[in-house]
Amino acid sequence: MSDRLTLLRPDDWHIHLRDGAVLTNTVADVARTFGRAIIMPNLVPPVRNAAEADGYRQRILAARPAGSRFEPLMVLYLTDRTQPEEIREAKASGFVHAAKLYPAGATTNSDSGVTSIDKIFPVLEAMAEAGMPLLIHGEVTRGDVDVFDREKIFIDEHMRRVVERFPTLKVVFEHITTGDAVQFVNEASANVGATITAHHLLYNRNHMLVGGIRPHFYCLPILKRNTHQEALLDAATSGSAKFFLGTDSAPHAQHAKEAACGCAGCYTAYAAIELYAEAFEQRNALDKLEAFASLNGPRFYGLPANTDRITLVRDEWTAPTSLPFGELTVIPLRAGEKLRWRLLEEHA
């Protein structure tokens, strides 16, 4: 087994950078590895139109490290009030690459999300016509639904209906966590893809709950049982072009995670490709990592792959116990633990 792995520079097709002073930290972490990233729009207030997306984009560009060529790919936040014309304007901008459907209340800063998918059918029609992908946080939010069943029920009640009603609409099932989602994506048309996080490949709910509650494993969609973890590993390492890298790296300050009512999100951007390499190595599938990390996403979005390269080496190192997050700190996933792969260098 080789101790060195060179890949076309990957992209992150789902990340949260937050806003304000913390951008200096979060942008540096993502730009270290990735050429581009799909930037989640769930700010307060959310990114609802092309003008707001451009403002956020300029703040991200200003936070890039000196010499960085990292490109943020912006996303609109869909609400019950989004208009088809706003989709057409966003598409014409050239820098908005998708729109995100958050069911109201599904995750961090989703209170402004869509209350009923039927309300945005005219918007979805405009997206299909414009060729703009729809990114879906696929969980129902009703109080009578068990948190571990939210994804499966969303598939049955909503996903099937959306892809049948809009067969030409490109749909990304974001951060899938279940074998049910893997099966749905595999059986759907080529217009349906999915992102998978490193933490859902590496961990299951036992890691979060057995022997004490570990708040830094808490995310939404929540970690599932190990059989679902295995299904995700099968999908990611299958070679199927339908599945691609999306970290869902979602930082919260330490005090907001280590609390009586802690926030959902795992911070992985600081070592994302290293974590994915560990997951693929578990399956003896490092030869499949480049397609998953560097090729499948651009192909789905109709963008060229990056041409420069990164190199990973098998060289154990210890993850930091904390990282700066503006004036506060964030505890990264695997804080203080050993990682097996290290990012070495880039090639022109």
UniProtKB/Swiss-Prot annotation:
Function: Catalyzes the reversible cyclization of carbamoyl aspartate to dihydroorotate.
Modified-residue entries (N6-carboxylysine), positions: 100
Originating gene: pyrC
Binding site for Zn(2+) 1: 14, 16, 100, 248
Keywords annotated in UniProt: Hydrolase, Metal-binding, Pyrimidine biosynthesis, Zinc
Pfam families, A to Z: Amidohydro_1
Organism: Pseudomonas fluorescens (strain Pf0-1)
Cellular component, GO, one term: cytosol
Top-tier EC class: hydrolase
A GO BP entry: 'de novo' UMP biosynthetic process
Cofactor: Zn(2+)
Active site: 248
Protein name, as recorded: Dihydroorotase
Positions annotated to bind Zn(2+) 2: 100, 137, 175
Record note on quaternary structure: Homodimer.
Entry annotated with the keyword Zinc: yes
Enzyme Commission identifier(s): 3.5.2.3
A GO molecular function held by the record: zinc ion binding
Cofactor binding mode and count: Binds 2 Zn(2+) ions per subunit.
